[in-house]
């Protein structure tokens, strides 16, 4: 499958003499080509994304074949991963055999079925063909003699970048040289870490800034600079001219642009993200490609003309014959006795049953085994939903998989009911913390904030706090200024050495005590005052979005969230909204451990705002008129679940009623035990803890404070399912921290709107998280970010390996691997399980084209559990 077949494009029929039409066509081409890469968020707000989000109109299998062809990237689990999973009992042989039977039934071939099955069974062992066999002179001679056999449609072609076809006199590929230059310019332009000397003319855009400097670049030869001396002033003109001089035809342009974007998907992804953030940079993708392809022309021009592009990929006959000899138990003598037609049939069959098909069957068997094990687990624990015990407190947690063990242990230790909901609690807000002039979106990255909420304090207390904070920040600012200044940077080691040396020693040998001391000291010094929020609507023309909510909006958001989790009656005296956050030291990926539903930030702010709204008399009065009656003695509070240490920190506790105080005290009394159990379960999964842990909570805190710790927690590794239904469906199930859990009561959703919004919002976030972990596991060299210990944080944006690599877009090795040879994360596509009648699922698939496409094309799996408890795979 060719590159351009991935993305549909309109035929270009306009004359080249029409400049305006050329520009419009170029815009369309770049827009279509951009779908082969995913936007990459800065690492400080590490937002989960999956690298194939723009390709979901194609099937997973098609994209896998395409990536294998053009980038040699394999997105199926490796043979070692599959063998390991089978040894652990994660793959049932029965599902593999049924998958093979279905595949054979779908194929047309003219060899005996028994012979084909025997070949496939051996090939499915995923053993490599012996190198001695592949290099056998006898076999290669045989292949030469039968190379005339017509393999029909088995040949394919791919479009190569011209620079990738040429090597310089030193033997270095010109595409590597081109990448080196592009990385340099991207770092200069995108720098977000406040470099003392910024790129000149940066405010005019990437292309113009590059155009102004390129003829002075000493890294280019005199002839290369000469090519670019009188280059067009605008990006579109430059891109058009470069493609023309390279000899790229109209029909190949989009495929050629795609190839350049895939060459450095990290930097290109960051460029794409930036282009979506402001009107001023909306042309950034065109500018990036103009710079890249213009530089390619300058580098390759001495070697032009060259016959490129569509390179016919000849089918290698040797491995196909070798596969029949090794797996099909055919000797060379038997092969020679066959007719040309028989040989051709065997070659065609072996070609079709290639490595991707074999791994696809294994992956599907792995996924089916997981689905069946989950079905059995749920079925064995099903209970009636109408006979609820007395509940003292209700706690709403984020759907994050790390909440599942914590909720399970909490429910065992008291009369508590827990709910699952996206951790932004349905509030589309941008938050501005006390003393900050900036705000950050605290909601899933697929949404845009509609309200700004500011943290407020008493004017006098705020003034004192601001002064203390200024002193605190001035220390960091002074240190940074001295470090970047030519003269003071030489003095800095003498001034800061003793203090930083002491910190290094103490942080290394007593990390838990020192970390706790520093955090408490800073908290004491800052003395943050009690705060409130700007909840009431304020019209401010200086702000892009309104501050606060109208009364109707307050009621609407509370109603919407309560209905989404099915909490509209039988309120407990205490309702706790639990956001979540992580705690780690010296960790560039700290945001990846925070709340994905809050855009890579902690969820406590949203939890506190929502709880405050629920306690407002006017909100309760309006809800009561609609039939949602919250008892007067029911109080909403907010807490933050710290996932690294499995503790609950109270962040908003108003005056409690007597019943609510009793519930609060009960939670406080059981929380140490909950933390102990949850930490023990979690820590035993880490590579360093195979023996019994004496004090799990103490060890968890050490991990959080140790600045040499490369794996403070597993994050969302091993996530595999997203269960949408009532808590009773999974309450007594040990889901091993692998399931996103979202409450849903189909009986309160006659229209299906609630289910649709869960799928469109939290469902999409869960899918992105799942496929990011999947991609980082199966193709770490392309979609992961390598080893944490050798990474370099660059430009305040992300990480690189060394100082001249692609901007690494995925998760580090430590987030998905148990050891060099063993994975921890199981690379399975997300299984979405919905507890609802069949007609609800049918309606969802009928109305939601995007979701239907994801299911049909294999980007997610779908199952349902009807009111009678019957499981159905869709």
Curated annotation (Swiss-Prot):
Matching PANTHER family: INORGANIC CARBON TRANSPORTER SUBUNIT DABA-RELATED (PTHR38344:SF1), UPF0753 PROTEIN AQ_863 (PTHR38344)
Q: Which InterPro entries match?
A: DabA (IPR018752)
Q: Which parts of the sequence bind Zn(2+)? A: 398, 400, 580, 595
Q: Which GO terms describe its molecular function?
A: zinc ion binding
Question: What keywords are annotated for this sequence in UniProt?
Answer: Cell membrane, Membrane, Metal-binding, Transport, Zinc
Task: State its cofactor.
Answer: Zn(2+)
Q: How does it assemble?
A: Forms a complex with DabB.
Question: Which species does this protein come from?
Answer: Bacillus cereus (strain ATCC 10987 / NRS 248)
* Task performed by this protein: Part of an energy-coupled inorganic carbon pump.
- What is the protein named? Probable inorganic carbon transporter subunit DabA
> Under the cellular component aspect of Gene Ontology, which terms does the record hold?
plasma membrane
Domain of life where this protein originates: Bacteria
Q: What's the chief localization of this chain? A: membrane
Membrane topology type, per the record? Peripheral membrane protein
Q: Where in the cell is it found?
A: Cell membrane
One Pfam family per UniProt: DabA
Q: Does the keyword Glycoprotein apply?
A: no
Q: Which family does it belong to?
A: Belongs to the inorganic carbon transporter (TC 9.A.2) DabA family.
């Amino acid at each position: 499958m060719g590159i351009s077949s991935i993305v549909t494009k309109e035929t270009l029929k306009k004359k080249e003499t029409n400049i305006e039409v050329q520009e419009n066509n170029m815009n369309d081409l770049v827009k279509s080509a951009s779908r082969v890469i995913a936007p990459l968020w800065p690492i400080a707000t590490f937002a989960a994304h999956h690298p194939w989000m723009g390709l979901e109109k194609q099937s997973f299998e098609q994209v896998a074949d395409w990536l294998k062809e053009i980038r040699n990237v394999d997105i199926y689990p490796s043979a070692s991963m599959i063998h390991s999973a089978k040894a652990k009992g994660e793959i049932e042989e029965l599902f593999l055999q049924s998958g093979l039977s279905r595949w054979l039934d779908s194929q047309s071939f003219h060899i005996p079925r028994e012979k084909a099955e025997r070949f496939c069974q051996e090939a499915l062992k995923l053993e490599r063909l012996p190198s001695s066999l592949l290099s056998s002179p006898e076999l290669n001679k045989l292949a030469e003699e039968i190379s005339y056999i017509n393999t029909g449609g088995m040949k394919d072609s791919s479009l190569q970048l011209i620079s990738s076809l040429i090597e310089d006199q030193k033997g270095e590929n010109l595409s590597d040289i081109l990448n080196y230059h592009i990385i340099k310019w991207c770092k200069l332009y995108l720098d977000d870490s406040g470099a003392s000397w910024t790129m000149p003319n940066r405010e005019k855009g990437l292309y113009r800034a590059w155009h102004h400097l390129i003829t002075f670049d000493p890294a280019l030869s005199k002839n290369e600079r000469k090519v670019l001396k009188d280059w067009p002033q605008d990006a579109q003109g430059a891109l058009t001219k470069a493609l023309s001089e390279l000899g790229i035809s109209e029909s190949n342009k989009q495929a050629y642009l795609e190839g350049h974007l895939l060459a450095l998907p990290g930097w290109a992804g960051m460029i794409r993200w930036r282009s979506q953030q402001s009107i001023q940079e909306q042309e950034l993708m065109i500018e990036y490609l103009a710079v890249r392809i213009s530089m390619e022309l300058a580098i390759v021009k001495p070697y032009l003309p060259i016959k490129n592009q569509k390179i016919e990929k000849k089918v290698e006959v040797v491995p196909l014959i070798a596969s029949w000899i090794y797996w099909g138990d055919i000797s060379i003598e038997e092969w020679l006795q066959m007719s040309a037609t028989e040989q051709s049939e065997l070659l065609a069959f072996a070609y079709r049953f290639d490595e991707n098909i074999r791994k696809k069957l294994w992956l599907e068997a792995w996924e089916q085994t997981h689905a069946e094990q989950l079905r059995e687990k749920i079925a064995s624990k099903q209970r009636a939903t109408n006979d609820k015990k007395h509940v003292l407190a209700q706690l709403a947690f984020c759907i994050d998989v790390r909440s599942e063990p914590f909720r399970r242990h909490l429910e065992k230790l008291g009369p508590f009911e827990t709910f699952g909901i996206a951790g932004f609690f349905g509030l589309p807000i941008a938050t501005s913390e006390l003393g900050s002039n900036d705000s950050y979106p605290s909601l899933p990255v697929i949404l845009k904030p509609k309200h700004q909420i500011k943290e407020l304090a008493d004017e006098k207390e705020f003034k004192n706090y601001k002064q203390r904070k200024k002193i605190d920040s001035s220390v960091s600012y002074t240190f940074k200024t001295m470090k970047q200044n030519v003269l003071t940077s030489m003095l800095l080691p003498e001034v800061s050495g003793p203090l930083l040396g002491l910190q290094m020693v103490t942080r290394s040998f007593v990390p838990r005590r020192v970390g706790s001391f520093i955090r408490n000291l800073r908290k004491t010094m800052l003395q943050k005052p009690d705060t409130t929020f700007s909840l009431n609507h304020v019209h401010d023309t200086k702000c892009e979005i309104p501050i606060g909510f109208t009364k109707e909006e307050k009621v609407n958001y509370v109603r919407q969230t309560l209905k989404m989790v099915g909490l509209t009656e039988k309120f407990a005296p205490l309702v706790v909204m639990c956001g979540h956050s992580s705690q780690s030291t010296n960790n560039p990926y700290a945001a990846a451990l925070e709340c994905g539903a809050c855009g890579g930030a902690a969820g406590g702010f949203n939890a506190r705002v929502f709880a405050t709204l629920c306690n407002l008399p006017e909100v309760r009065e309006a809800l009561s008129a609609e039939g949602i009656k919250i008892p007067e003695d029911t109080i909403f509070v907010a807490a933050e679940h710290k996932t690294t240490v499995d503790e609950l920190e109270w962040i908003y506790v108003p005056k409690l009623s007597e019943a609510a105080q009793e519930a609060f005290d009960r939670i406080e009394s059981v929380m140490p035990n909950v933390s102990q159990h949850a930490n023990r379960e979690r820590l035993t999964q880490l590579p360093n803890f195979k023996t019994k842990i004496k004090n799990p909570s103490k060890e968890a805190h050490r991990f959080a404070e140790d600045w040499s710790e490369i794996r403070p927690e597993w994050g969302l590794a091993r996530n595999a399912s997203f269960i949408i239904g009532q808590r009773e469906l999974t309450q007594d199930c040990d889901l091993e921290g692998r399931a996103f859990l979202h409450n849903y009561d189909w009986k309160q959703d006659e229209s299906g709107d609630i289910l649709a919004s869960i799928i469109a919002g939290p469902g999409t976030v869960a899918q992105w998280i799942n496929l990011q972990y999947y991609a980082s596991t199966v193709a770490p060299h392309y979609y992961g970010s390598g080893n944490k210990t050798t990474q370099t944080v660059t430009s305040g944006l992300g990480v690189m390996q060394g100082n001249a690599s692609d901007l690494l877009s995925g998760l580090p090795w430590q987030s998905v691997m148990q050891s060099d040879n063993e994975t921890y994360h199981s690379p399975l596509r997300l299984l979405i399980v919905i507890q609802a009648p069949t007609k609800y699922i049918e309606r969802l698939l009928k109305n939601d084209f995007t979701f239907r496409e994801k299911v049909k094309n294999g980007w997610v799996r779908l199952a349902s559990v009807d009111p009678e408890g019957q499981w159905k795979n869709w």
